[in-house]
Design a protein with these regions (language model features):
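Tryptophan-centric aromatic hotspots in well-structured domains and transmembrane helices
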Residues: 1, 23, 46-49, 101-102, ...
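Short catalytic/ligand-binding loop motif for oxyanion handling, primarily in non-cytosolic enzymes
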Residues: 2-6, 53-55, 94-97
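Catalytic beta-strand/loop cores that center a nucleophilic Ser/Cys/Thr
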Residues: 35-83, 88-89
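A short catalytic or substrate-binding loop motif that flags glycine-/basic-rich loops and adjacent residues
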Residues: 17, 68-71, 137
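Short C-terminal domain-edge/linker segments immediately following a structured domain
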Residues: 25-28, 56-57, 75-78, 107-108, ...
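Acyltransferase
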Residues: 82, 87-180
Length: 180
């Protein structure tokens, strides 16, 4: 959210209560390789007190929303030039991260709600089901492969030349978008 504000002036807003849980997200745009291999809908953990309104992101001509949740809002967005990727979810979370956050907030007497779609039968004494790992691995693999490895020149002169780096990223995005 800070990056969306810094680069595009998109303000975030406070939510009425903490958004916490594992939410269903749907793919909005299959033309970019960042979500290659994703199912039409996939699960991803979210945990935050603020959000950048989806209408602001959809209205920004320099951004391409890639995935969105009805409950959690925009999940993944990329700049049109492919150089900036923003995730409002927590693909890095392991099985117990939301559990630790929930128990921490209980200890602080913050009266947190149970994370949505996380504990089996909403029972916090049971081990949470890990339902997002495959898509997280795919996301990171695609990012490294398509946006870092294939778009990075390996000669010092090219690395230092910003115009060539931009052209490589844009060319890669245009070339691969036709495959979808």
């Amino acid at each position: 959210q800070a990056g969306l504000y810094y680069y595009y002036g998109l303000d975030k807003m406070m939510l009425k209560e903490k958004l916490s849980g594992v939410y269903r997200n749907r793919v909005l745009n299959r033309k970019l390789p960042l979500i290659r291999g994703f199912d039409d809908e996939f699960l991803m953990p979210h945990s935050r007190y603020t959000e950048t309104p989806a209408a602001l992101i959809h209205g920004c001509k320099d951004l391409v929303p890639l995935a969105e949740s009805e409950e959690a809002g925009i999940m993944l967005v990329v700049s049109k030039d492919g150089r900036r990727i923003f995730s409002m979810a927590h693909a890095e979370y392991d099985r117990l991260t939301l559990d630790h956050e929930y128990k921490r907030d209980l200890e602080k007497d913050l009266r947190p709600k149970l994370p949505v779609n996380y504990y089996p039968e909403d029972d916090p004494t049971r081990e949470p089901c890990l339902s997002w790992r495959a898509h997280c691995n795919t996301l990171y693999t695609n990012w490294i492969n398509y946006y870092v490895y294939q778009a990075t020149p390996y000669q010092w002169g090219q690395i230092l030349d910003e115009k060539r780096r931009n052209a490589a990223t844009i060319n890669l995005t245009e070339r691969l978008s036709d495959d979808f």
